[in-house]
Amino acid sequence: MENQALIAQCEKVAQSWMNSACYDAETQKAVKAMVENPDKTELIDSFYRTLEFGTGGLRGIMGPGTNRMNIYTVGAATQGLSNYLNLNFKDMEQISVVVGHDSRNNSRLFAETAANIFSANGIKVYLFEDMRPTPEMSFAIRHLGCQSGICLLYTSPSPRD
């Protein structure tokens, strides 16, 4: 894609973040700064694609944008998993999930965001009070008879996260 077309595409998505009541003021301010910056590198990297699940899960640098880890991308992924669980386990009396996290920046916030979205979708949530290692989370899913679980872990190569 030509650079100007890519910039225009990214600016269009960024504008939707700036103009929607769905996003908090701090996020909107950061996005506005990217749009107004003559150097479009950060804007492009933040909005040129949507984070996708890979072998390591949902991975990315923290910050505003569709290609970043933030409460909005975590929320969208959680809503997708909620939809899947409600569709595929609709005959169960109660669908349940385990939500865990580690000590990285915003990990607890992301875990609470996910827990709230699961709950809003009628899914019972077992949210660990504190950080836990992945094997403990895996054990909890089986021990509690949950249909799924998510663990918000540090996986970004960025030292700023």
What spans do the regions from the language model cover?
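Conserved small/polar residues in nucleotide/adenosyl-binding loops
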Residues: Y154-D161
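An N-terminal, well-structured beta->alpha segment
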Residues: Q15-A114
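Eukaryotic, polar/proline-rich low-complexity intrinsically disordered regions
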Residues: A8-E11, D24
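Short, well-ordered strand-loop elements centered on a beta-strand within folded domains, enriched
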Residues: C10-V13, W17, S156
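Secondary-structure boundary motif
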Residues: L87-D91, H143, D161
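N-terminal small/polar loop signature for handling phosphorylated ligands or for N-terminal nucleophile
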Residues: V98-L152
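Short hydrophobic/aromatic residue motifs in ordered secondary structure
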Residues: G57-R59, L127, D161
